[in-house]
Amino acid sequence: MQIDDDDWWTDLGHKARKDFGRKPVIEIDVLEGVEPLDAQFGVTLPRTVPVTLQEPLFGQPADSGQDPDVLYTYAVLDAAKILGLPELLENTDLDHDCLFQGTAAEELRHAAPWIVKLEENNRFTRALFTKGSGPRDLWDSDPGIFCRSKHTLDDVRKHLRKFTKVRDGHGRWLYFRFWEGVPLRAYLDTVSLEHPASLSFYGTAERLLIDAVLTRDYAGRFVKHHCQAIPDTLESNASGRLTSVQEQALAT
């Protein structure tokens, strides 16, 4: 498979400026008590997501007197966990695309990651958070992660494609299934000003592509990583490799 120059990490290791160290880079919120939706039979206005997730997934920036950019909600879903996901998405009115492309997208479409722009009051969005015995009650499948972004699906897709494959400390390519919440959270938890490599998952100093990421852990809690900002003076690390801390986190 041919690798495009902009497909993989080229700007991973950074050193933050000193004054930036006084500001929080990432805010981490653990959302406890998230209860999945039930069938909501007889409910006039059924909920789209659990109450606890309404603001994290569909809330908008506070009105500061200026026109704030709208935050969109994206899910990156594992087709191996949802039977017939490509066909299911084709029958929705939601924007979506496969993170793989070319031959890989065709041959692996039923096991590939798919990005979909979620909308409120949408049946598919609701299904992701509904627990039940039906074939489209998808809560128990825990199929992916959720992102908030001010950018289009095409922009977010192009950015996330860079992270399907990473280099370890020996320069070897590794597949990174970041659409599985537990390994992604382990990776994002390694952010620090000493080793802020995973800030690149959110974007660059010039362009913040991902404002927040929500993942679900083994205990059923949701964890929200919110990127406040990316330092505007960063030094590139030409090696573009995972730090030892990140390797240990992903191996756990």
Model-predicted segments: where are they?
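Terminal low-complexity "docking" segments
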Residues: 1-177, 181-252
